[in-house]
A protein has these predicted regions:
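A preference for well-ordered globular domain cores
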Residues: 1-145
Length: 145
């Protein structure tokens, strides 16, 4: 079950996230391993004072590379961090729940997207869920999308 949960978590992380940028549009960014490393490079460029940071939208090699402003790239890297951290935290809470199960029936109730009982939620997951609730979400199943 832990392998199933890990696989779903990794798939969700890699599929990426959406973020609204200064143009008012929602943009999608993938989080393949090379994307995650490149986001770190972008943060270094921001800290060096770069004002135009090149990136291929959605990790695509079929679209032209474009420049993103420092503010937009900061939004992108912040969203990337939140996306990865939330899903890793949620996955770890699911695995704690898996460890606590005593029957096959209980184990079957656990899947990626299930609401983790509060007993198995880390403090970090509780904080993420509370923040999600305050902006209109209601539970993990919405948050893990």
């Amino acid at each position: 079950k832990k392998q199933e949960v890990n696989a779903a978590c990794n798939k969700t992380i890699v599929e990426g996230f959406d973020v609204e940028l200064s143009d008012g549009q929602i943009h999608h960014f993938t989080m393949k391993e090379e994307d995650q490393i490149a986001f770190l490079t972008c943060l270094a460029l921001i800290s060096k004072g770069e004002t135009a940071i090149p990136w291929h939208p959605n990790g695509s090699s079929t679209q032209p590379c474009v420049f993103y402003s420092t503010d937009d790239m900061q939004k992108i890297t912040d969203a990337a961090y939140e996306h990865r951290t939330f899903h890793t935290t949620y996955c770890n809470s699911l695995k704690i729940w898996v460890e606590a199960t005593e029957t096959a029936e209980e184990l079957q109730e656990i899947y990626y997207g299930a609401d983790v009982p509060e007993t198995y939620q880390s403090d970090v997951l509780k904080a993420y869920l509370k923040a999600k609730e305050s902006v209109g979400g209601t539970d993990e199943s919405e948050a893990v999308r």
